[in-house]
């Protein structure tokens, strides 16, 4: 090793950065400190690694103020293959999956049944509400294995990230007196009991936070008649305001919400009167609410009439096969609307997406373009919902489709569970395909 000895007086300028933590998880901006020293150096000519500390990035509330991305359709993004993997591994029994992202990464959520599939406890898991159900959370694309985190106790849920921490809304308890727990940054901050004593429930997809205020739609009351829907405004887990539903929507459940700065917009399920989907507009600043229905005459719920006879006047439920339904989504694109729905008009089979020209602005619009098949009509689908991803220049809309397997339709087995497939908006070109669950029911544990 060569050694060079240098004896001299020099002035060194070191740019050091201090990163002092303050209360409430705030981070002091890094400030340079100039240090001057007179030194004598012995320099060893060898390989040297110099490491510098990088200050943590200042966490900020999300505001979602960028424009919506212009898209031509949707491209495949993720598929977890949970049911296929359950044939030979310990995978949770789940339903009601959804996706939500923090500023750096996307996660998949689902309501577990307190059991894996190859387990006798999986018998009769067709039931929605039991005390053993918990909200599961994994990085998107990671199936719900035994090491999966159970975020909270819940048979109905919603989750969203405000830019600083996760908020989870978790409903559990008796049908006639359930409790909603509000968990922020891993801590229980607030709670609310049932207000109509008839299955308090929430979105089964992501809530939305703008400038630190998160909003979630909750319903308590009849699933096939008049119910009491309220919109909650939450700051760091604390309920700060509750607004009643107003406008012309008659029945609102299982909303799929997205940021439409400075407001939040939701597309929901009318389980009483309409196969056209209700819209709920939420003003974050003044807590005001308005509602109506998607104008497209190609309606989004299941069951529904055939496309020739289906209708929507933008304001009222269409009174066409309104009783029963399925969670779904749509989003506005100028005067047009992008939407997804089952291919079957009668059952949760197949899945398609398309754009309806003037479907957001003109009653009974039926001009369809850019149709894509996500799941072919011979395979089962289920719930679907929206989530938003902020990129450098715009906000992209993505959706997931629940792929239900087992009971009631597949009576060889005693369980009911699901996997998930996810697509995101693209401005590029795309091909064709079908992405069903893919499990051979004869290979599965009974």
From Swiss-Prot:
Subcellular location: Virion membrane; Host apical cell membrane
Gene Ontology MF, one: exo-alpha-sialidase activity
Membrane topology recorded in Swiss-Prot or TrEMBL: Single-pass type II membrane protein
Regulation: Inhibited by the neuraminidase inhibitors zanamivir (Relenza) and oseltamivir (Tamiflu). These drugs interfere with the release of progeny virus from infected cells and are effective against all influenza strains. Resistance to neuraminidase inhibitors is quite rare.
Catalytic function, reaction form: Hydrolysis of alpha-(2->3)-, alpha-(2->6)-, alpha-(2->8)- glycosidic linkages of terminal sialic acid residues in oligosaccharides, glycoproteins, glycolipids, colominic acid and synthetic substrates
Location, primary (coarse class): virion
Region (Head of neuraminidase): 68-446
Residue segments, region Hypervariable stalk region: 13-65
Residues with glycosylation annotation: 38, 47, 63, 123, 177, 211, 379
Compositionally biased spans, kind Polar residues: 308-320
Cofactor annotation: Ca(2+)
Record: residues binding substrate: 95, 129, 253-254, 269, 348
Keyword Plastid: no
Annotated disulfide bonds: 69-394, 101-106, 160-207, 209-214, 255-268, 257-266, 295-314, 398-424
Alphabetized UniProt keyword annotations: Calcium, Disulfide bond, Glycoprotein, Glycosidase, Host cell membrane, Host membrane, Hydrolase, Membrane, Metal-binding, Signal-anchor, Transmembrane, Transmembrane helix, Virion
EC number: 3.2.1.18
UniProt remark on domains: Intact N-terminus is essential for virion morphogenesis. Possesses two apical sorting signals, one in the ectodomain, which is likely to be a glycan, and the other in the transmembrane domain. The transmembrane domain also plays a role in lipid raft association.
Stated family: Belongs to the glycosyl hydrolase 34 family.
More about this protein: The influenza A genome consist of 8 RNA segments. Genetic variation of hemagglutinin and/or neuraminidase genes results in the emergence of new influenza strains. The mechanism of variation can be the result of point mutations or the result of genetic reassortment between segments of two different strains.
Oligomeric form and interacting partners: Homotetramer.
Protein's name in the database: Neuraminidase
Natural source organism: Influenza A virus (strain A/Swine/Hong Kong/127/1982 H3N2)
